[in-house]
Amino acid sequence: MKIGFDHEKYIEEQSKYILERVNNYDKLYLEFGGKLLYDLHAKRVLPGFDENAKIKLLHKLKEKVEIIICVYAGDIERNKIRGDFGITYDVDVLRLIDDLRSYDLQVNSVVITRYSGQPSTTVFINKLERRGIKVYKHEATKGYPADVDTIVSDEGYGKNPYIETTKPIVVVTAPGPGSGKLATCLSQLYHEYKQGKVAGYSKFETFPVWNVPLKHPLNIAYEAATVDLKDVNMIDSFHFDAYNEVAVNYNRDIESFPLLKRIIEKITGEESGYKSPTDMGVNRVGYGIIDDEVVKKASEQEIIRRYFKTGCEYKKGYLDKETLHRSKIIMHELNLKEDDRKVVMPAREYSAKLKKRYNKNEVYPVVALELEDGKVLTGRNSDVMDGTAAVILNAVKYLANISDEIHLISPVILEPIINLKLKTLGSKSTALTCEEILIALSICAVTNPTAQVAMEKLSMLRGCQAHSTTILSGNEEQTFRKLGIDITCDPEYPSESLYYNN
């Protein structure tokens, strides 16, 4: 993989800049946008970026940092899913606490925002409190968004309980957008100033990158990733007016800046030092880019990947037609086509061949996988295994120089598993999933040295690209995610069945 980003340089620059910002205050509330851990989007568009860069940055500052996690009560009630992991937001909060603790970072508390006694949220609160985690409940802010006098009063932010903190940097993070991070920061600012303390607010948002051109694929990839939020990158007019310098920000931050500035000035009683939303940010990711061409190409591939994802989400009913249309416009903006993703055409061509051979009306499920050396392999559905499983076996055979004729998994192992699925568990399909095949392979590896050699090649699939001609099940997507393979799908179901496609 070609590297376009210097991780070490970025960490050094970023930590120095945050410490410079905190020097102006007794305490700095730092709103962390995006993902604190496993930032796979950043890793894909900035080759060389560490997906856990942010948490490693905080670990470097751990003596000065404590963390507040926000989660919106409505997201818990409707079981909102974090797309990249396939887990609900409440479960992600638990995962986040565990991950932060593993980096020796102090988790202060969890804040439930816009809480109004929702039943599922109350159960979640009980679960946290009984595990010794402090929980604060914040109601919707009275007067928000327009009535600044009410917002900045004992009826507004003053109604929220004050969260006791001890470190100079308080990071406020969340499982996803719309979790109430900003409101929590401002509520704390209000209480700090009431107590006579000088506190500040800043924002750490990786994308869009303020010092990279507006129409750079890196910034357009951010629009593609947030197409459902209707985020649009714009020139920060406030920044240009103040400094005669071009900076990129996104529409929501630019639109909300005048109100946010007024709220901060009302809380502090003095003019804000921030002249623009870009001023509020502390992001230095642009300074870590060392090869612009590599970043451009990686970002273009991410835009195509996001386009396929949007198509599948639309097919499943999660997104509206306007979002799908916007995704297409982003593709056209950079003259990108579906087949610019190398794995797409091999999968489709093999699928069309099989469809013709078996005289099927439906799309034939095929998965294509590109290895690091550029070799593209395919796998198809059969009675024994899914296409996902077939392509993984084909890949490890290729990497281990094992002949295609050699069976890695003994029929003695396969038959009892198939019988268990069909006869005991009552499964409609005998075909083994990718995960089931990998378990079978690991069993065979105990007595079969060839299978053991193949098993050892699985780690070489991390970072590979794949494409499926049909929508995969959640379990199959999860398995590929665990293997570190980026997979896209055509927005087609493998059959006309409704329930058994889920």
Curated annotation (Swiss-Prot):
Family according to the record: Belongs to the UPF0371 family.
Name recorded for this polypeptide: UPF0371 protein CTC_00401
Organism for this UniProt entry: Clostridium tetani (strain Massachusetts / E88)
Lineage of the species this protein comes from: Bacteria, Bacillati, Bacillota, Clostridia, Eubacteriales
